[in-house]
UniProtKB/Swiss-Prot annotation:
Substrate binds at residues 88, 181, 211, 296. It catalyses: S-adenosyl-L-homocysteine + H2O + H(+) = S-inosyl-L-homocysteine + NH4(+); S-methyl-5'-thioadenosine + H2O + H(+) = S-methyl-5'-thioinosine + NH4(+). Belongs to the metallo-dependent hydrolases superfamily. MTA/SAH deaminase family. Its EC number is 3.5.4.28, 3.5.4.31. The gene is mtaD. It is an enzyme of class 3 (hydrolase). This is 5-methylthioadenosine/S-adenosylhomocysteine deaminase. Binds 1 zinc ion per subunit. Its cofactor is Zn(2+). It comes from Aquifex aeolicus (strain VF5). InterPro entries: Amidohydro-rel, Deaminase_MtaD/DadD, Metal-dep_hydrolase_composite, Metal_Hydrolase, MTA/SAH_deaminase.
Amino acid sequence: MEKYDLLIKNVLIPEKEGEWDIAVKDGKIEKIGKNIVGEAKYTINGKGKIAFPSFANMHTHISMTLLRGLGADLPLHDWLQKVIWPLEGEFVSPEFVKDGALLGIVESIRSGTTLFMDMYFFEEAVAEACEDVGIRAGLGFGILDFPTKVAKTPEEYIQRARKFAEEFKNRELVFPVICPHAPYTCSPNTLRMAKELADEYGLLLHIHVAETKEEVERIKEQYGKTPVEHLESIGFLDKNVLCAHMVWTTEKEREILKERDVKIAHCPESNLKLASGIAPVPDYVKRGITVTLGTDGAASNDNLNMLEETSTCAKFHKGYNLDAKAIDAGTALKIATENGFKVAGIKAGKVEEGYEADLILVDTDFPEFQPLYDPISQFVYSANSECIDTVICKGKVLMEKRELKTVDQEEIFAKARKWREKILSKLSSL
């Protein structure tokens, strides 16, 4: 008799007729079939549930959950300079980062995410939180030209990034990423050093690019080129580059992105809230540029809900482009799942044999799914995260029946409330 680590019985799978069993072994989907017979360490009754791939949040600053709700209704640069950076200068520490990361991880799991791509400070603390809970993450120190608590010079940032890459390069769930912040906060030399480090270790480069008109004008004034043209001119762009936002790009820049096989992390809700603009995602997709989805930080979104982000991605581009087919439900879901895992180098994002068992089970016993005609469109357009019953990462059950299995939610909430008191005290003096 076959032995499995996990057996999901009688579950629905989009675009397959009837009920199916999913057998998981060593973190992978070993078999999908009818009435699978085998001995399983753990069995889940999937009756009335739909199996989808879990979400990959490809751009966030997860510890900023502790700054959520501050500086509302400000544009990006005012929000950063008047609220976020002063508070980070005061409070960011390994303890702040881990507590914020745990809060963000709880929110992420509850909304179906098993992989996130993070750029922040003290990423060792985020790695510890991820490994404690059992969630995947690509992690990188923000590399800057100006001093912060973690480094004083670009060379020091690079040194910290190198040390982190060396320490975490062979972990099971977390992996290092090189994260120069943006072309307007990193000199050409800093960007080149970051690229050299990423290439040396075979890592992704994760960077903010062309988020606002103001940024584009600043780069043009400083370098005489648009952001993408500037990055191309210094030899930065390559297939291992993940650019967050990419809201303001020209025809020429899009040709460069396609030619260099640059990847994009689209963050529609953050771009809307900060009034940054609307990324030309349908055009990117049409050109064959790989687009992934991200929430950005919880302080600028203001949540980490990837189902909500997926729905916004699909709906907003329809309205903005006056085209109901601009981004359909299936494309939005692929952008939010399969594309992200692929960019991260993880064979997940599909409910298929041989793929990593990063899955969610969505309960159809909700009005949003009654009657059930089209699981994908009803998940993207109708459902909310309360419909997500079970979350599985690399074959490990992180949530079942909406109950978190690997983390104490109430303990994390209590820590968040303590940070609130400290932050409110500081705000009164700003």
